[in-house]
């Protein structure tokens, strides 16, 4: 990959400023709007925030992990950083498009790279009805919540909720309940990425529900519609010996 213009993004309040200063000295970085690659230094959260901020530019992102898990990031290797970027492989992520309506009738939309989740706002369990492609699949789910995850996000919140991990090229989505109370033994569903999933919240006055797309939260929701979109693809760069597909496979074996 022939790359000449690279932009650098990092948190100016990071506790790793000494390392960041080393990286800043490696290259004459350009403005973000002029870049062919955007380097994001930090953790998965920092990367996700900046993907949402700059995905409209259609520029590939290369994450350098200075956080904890860093599932979407590359390991820090200051000496080989530029070489690793030039030799990197590309993973294409298609985000989820979420549309929500709140109790006042206001409609909002948001994109999610990892997952869309809905969850109870009070101590009472949420109740909702689930449709897939316009067909009712569950008349009532009583749970703390539910989520729809992309393959890239299937190893995040979805995995913690006992959902399955999806291969990156699977063209599938995870629909996973969060602490399901009724039906107690329902563990979710695997759906084609072309599916449209709708949650209708039941008894919203007594059992209010919030919804999030990654980190964007909306309160007092009456219904949520989720579908994958190919209109806003995100390109992530990974070291050739440390691809996202490899990480997803490794995660399934407890790696």
From Swiss-Prot:
A GO biological process held by the record: NAD metabolic process
Catalytic reaction equation(s): NAD(+) + ATP = ADP + NADP(+) + H(+)
EC number(s) stated in the UniProt entry for this protein: 2.7.1.23
Gene Ontology MF, one: NAD binding
Position of the signal peptide: none
Subcellular location: Cytoplasm
Annotated InterPro entries: ATP-NAD_kinase_N, ATP-NAD_kinase_PpnK-typ_C, NAD/diacylglycerol_kinase_sf, NADK
Keyword vocabulary terms for this entry: ATP-binding, Cytoplasm, Kinase, NAD, NADP, Nucleotide-binding, Transferase
GO CC term (a single one): cytoplasm
Cofactor(s) required, per the database record: a divalent metal cation
KW NAD (keyword) present: yes
Top-rank EC class of the record's enzyme: transferase
HAMAP family on file: NAD_kinase
Family of this protein: Belongs to the NAD kinase family.
Protein's name according to its UniProt entry: NAD kinase
């Amino acid at each position: 990959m022939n790359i000449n213009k690279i932009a650098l993004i990092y948190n100016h309040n990071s506790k790793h400023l000494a390392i960041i200063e080393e990286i800043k000295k490696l290259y004459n970085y350009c403005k973000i709007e002029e870049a062919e690659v955007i380097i994001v230094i930090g953790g998965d959260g920092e990367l996700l925030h900046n993907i949402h901020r700059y995905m409209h530019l259609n520029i590939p992102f290369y994450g350098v992990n200075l956080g904890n898990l860093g599932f979407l990031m590359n390991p820090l290797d200051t000496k080989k950083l530029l070489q690793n970027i030039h030799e990197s492989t590309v993973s294409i992520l298609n985000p989820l498009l979420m549309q929500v309506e709140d109790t006042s009738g206001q409609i909002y939309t948001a994109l999610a790279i990892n997952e869309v989740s809905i969850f109870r706002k009070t101590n009472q369990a949420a109740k909702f009805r689930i449709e897939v492609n316009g067909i009712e699949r569950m008349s009532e789910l009583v749970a703390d919540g539910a989520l729809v995850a992309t393959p890239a996000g299937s190893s995040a919140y979805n995995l913690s909720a006992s959902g399955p991990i999806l291969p990156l090229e699977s063209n599938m989505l995870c629909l996973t309940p969060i602490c399901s109370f009724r039906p107690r033994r329902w563990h979710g569903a695997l759906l084609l990425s072309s599916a449209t999933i709708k949650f209708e919240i039941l008894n919203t006055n007594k059992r209010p529900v919030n919804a999030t797309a990654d980190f964007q939260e909306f309160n007092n929701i009456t219904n949520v519609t989720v579908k994958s979109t190919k209109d806003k693809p995100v390109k992530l760069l990974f070291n050739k010996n440390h691809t996202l597909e490899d990480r997803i496979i490794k995660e399934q074996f407890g790696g």
